[in-house]
């Protein structure tokens, strides 16, 4: 999604 790659999980 938006922060996919920045956070350890995309959008749960």
From Swiss-Prot:
Pfam families: Periviscerokin
Record has Chaperone as a keyword: no
GO terms of biological process kind: neuropeptide signaling pathway
Matches recorded under InterPro entries: Periviscerokinin
Residue stretches spanning the membrane: none
The entry's keywords: Amidation, Neuropeptide, Secreted
Domain of life of the source: Eukaryota
Protein name: CAPA-Periviscerokinin-1
């Amino acid at each position: 999604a938006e922060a996919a790659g920045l956070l350890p999980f995309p959008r749960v």
